[in-house]
């Protein structure tokens, strides 16, 4: 694979100098700062990420445990928040008489989060990492509080939007913190540990939400974030988190806000993202895909995005998304790979429960238990692969293997029928989860290993945006595939049943609206439609394999910069 060019290295040095004129750029030929990659065909030396610049050594021991526990809990809560509301929604709509607002309970969070994510990269690049992370989490907690005390559906939607604003900077902030705390070869293990445990929030969210809704009140779906947030505050408040590059202090912060955050770029990007996501939300649901509203939103998003690209090109290295960074093969392929990975994860997370609830006839809580094999195997492989990458140094084999295994796993899901045995759906899910887990963190490691410290926060933000963008897009595609297929298959397998009555009834209530003699045909139509959705996931998994080839064959075990001496506290 092509390694970073000399031109890119010169650009990196220029960006560091431009961002911090009081410092000289790092000597790219210094032995301690360069790791020569033997596997590169051109033998070009690769600048290795530097360590903390605030005079502190890498974080170890109990302080590292406290930091990792804190950021893992925060990421867990954020992912829990995305799924816990699903089982509480029926009770919420009954209390507020707000069935037409159901879509906004999820999309308000998504719109606010996706539109802010790129700006969070500039925030972490220019401001104190620890306090930026804590601030985003505080906003997330405020949103949770607003949702918990909501007295109307509109107040709940506002609370979800506020929580989304806070959530926009949590994951990329966690990855940036890990990059500043430990050397490169230790990051895969810690990143895998964080992602492995945090993503348990996705699967246990519906279980906890169902329990709260049934035995206490749906408001505890949001209140639960508050006491855990207090624990996180105690874990992080008194621990120093090293910085990978100098950050401004005092009055210079005002200069950074005005000149370095690229607020114009944000003002152009945010409406483009919101219009695009709204078009996906409305299309095929509230409005037809060929309606003037949906077409207008797509056109508005495209026009605004063109203006955003032109502005970013004009801003150069001070742009919210620097052109010199996004043109790097490792960066853009990492973004695409992570986006496709999240697409496969979300498609399975949404449609496996539909298979179990609609076709197998189980309730929401039990369907959450039934998808545990994929989530647990994913978490286990994320932790194991991270440890092994740190030990042997190469991330690309894991990403390629993950794409292959995930493709096979999704392919096996397309064979599901109403009579699929327990052993098969457990085994297929284990294979699927293992494939996703093996490659889940590799795009993050690839980007961090190939970028200088000033660009790591921006790259993490861009990768997180691709997570939202690809996830939303593929879920919309999946919805179109499922709905159209269900209409066609109902005509084939249950011709006496009106397709629209089944679609309107929903995945859990259609059994009551179907005559007993027609139910087997309806179940078969449902099963075939879910199978077609998994074909889409197969395509996304294959794409992760293809684009992984561009992430580069690099050994992360390069020489680290000399550690600062002294007995300063971490």
UniProtKB/Swiss-Prot annotation:
Glycans are attached at residue 290. CDD domains: MFS_Azr1_MDR_like. Induction: Expression is positively regulated by the azaphilone pigments (MonAzPs) gene cluster-specific transcription regulator pigB. MFS-type transporter; part of the gene cluster that mediates the biosynthesis of azaphilone pigments (MonAzPs), very widely used as food colorant. One of its GO terms (molecular function) is transmembrane transporter activity. It comes from the Eukaryota. This is MFS-type transporter pigP. Disruption phenotype: Does not affect the production of azaphilone pigments (MonAzPs). It holds the Pfam family MFS_1. Residues 28-41 have a biased composition (Basic and acidic residues). One of its GO terms (cellular component) is plasma membrane. It is found in: Cell membrane. As colorants, MonAzPs are widely used in various food products for centuries. Moreover, MonAzPs also possess wide-ranging biological activities such as antibacterial activity, preventing hypertension, lowering cholesterol levels, causing hypolipidemic effects, and displaying antiobesity and antitumor activities. Keywords: Cell membrane, Glycoprotein, Membrane, Pigment, Transmembrane, Transmembrane helix, Transport. SUPFAM superfamilies: MFS general substrate transporter. Residues 14-54 are annotated as: Disordered. The chain crosses the membrane at residues 65-85, 99-119, 131-151, 162-182, 192-212, 221-241, 263-283, 293-313, 336-356, 369-389, 392-412, 425-445, 455-475, 533-553. It is a multi-pass membrane protein. Belongs to the major facilitator superfamily. TCR/Tet family. PROSITE patterns: MFS.
